[in-house]
């Protein structure tokens, strides 16, 4: 199984799939915000940034997937983004499932001073919604429950691929004649 993931990580198509799936999730989030009028909360914005980290890792791996160093850097970025996104989305889910006056998220995104995404790109990163409010459901699950599943899948997949990097692939036997 690990050799399958190792081989997969050396193919551009796998990295393109990671990149495009994360971009698709970003596009869906923007449709929910601008098309359906659902206001994103601070946690939603942080989850978007984590998805962008996964997209960046996919783009990085897409550049030169046969380089072990670049693959490891891309996997570390993607895995740390997926884990951070999972942690944020679980906290967000806790706010939705067990709302209380003393458990509220901030009304303002707290980005570093050197990277104020909410000021540079307010249409993408300016929060205006409530973290504890459930505004959309699909198949009985809220958007946050779906994003927890998505981040868990990204974390599992990227962890397996990262672990598989220590596995040596069998060298291809080149035969001149069959």
Swiss-Prot record:
It is a multi-pass membrane protein. Disulfide bonds join 41-44, 105-131. The chain crosses the membrane at residues 15-31, 50-65, 73-90, 146-164. Its main location: membrane. GO terms for biological process: protein folding. InterPro entries: DiS_bond_form_DsbB/BdbC, Disulphide_bond_form_DsbB, DsbB, DsbB-like_sf. It comes from the Bacteria. It is found in: Cell inner membrane. GO terms for molecular function: electron transfer activity; protein-disulfide reductase activity. One of its GO terms (cellular component) is plasma membrane. Signal peptide: none annotated. The keyword Chaperone applies. Residues 1-14, 66-72, 165-177 are cytoplasmic. Keywords: Cell inner membrane, Cell membrane, Chaperone, Disulfide bond, Electron transport, Membrane, Oxidoreductase, Redox-active center, Transmembrane, Transmembrane helix, Transport. Pfam families: DsbB. Residues 32-49, 91-145 are periplasmic. Belongs to the DsbB family. Required for disulfide bond formation in some periplasmic proteins. Acts by oxidizing the DsbA protein. This is Disulfide bond formation protein B.
């Amino acid at each position: 199984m690990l050799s399958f993931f190792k081989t997969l990580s050396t193919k551009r198509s796998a990295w393109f799939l990671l990149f495009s799936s994360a971009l698709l999730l970003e596009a869906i989030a923007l449709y929910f915000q601008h098309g359906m009028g659902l206001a994103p909360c601070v946690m939603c914005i942080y989850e978007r940034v984590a998805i962008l980290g996964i997209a960046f890792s996919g783009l990085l791996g897409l550049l030169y997937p046969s380089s072990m160093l670049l693959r490891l850097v891309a996997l570390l970025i993607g895995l740390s983004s997926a884990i951070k996104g999972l942690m944020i989305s679980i906290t967000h889910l806790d706010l939705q499932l067990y709302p209380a006056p003393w458990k509220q998220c901030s009304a303002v995104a707290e980005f570093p001073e050197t990277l104020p995404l909410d000021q540079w790109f307010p249409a993408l990163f300016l929060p205006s919604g409530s973290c504890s409010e459930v505004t959309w459901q699909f198949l009985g699950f809220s958007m946050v429950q779906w994003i927890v599943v998505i981040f868990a899948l990204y974390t599992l997949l990227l962890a397996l691929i990262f672990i598989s990097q220590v596995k040596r692939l069998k060298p291809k036997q080149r035969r001149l004649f069959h």
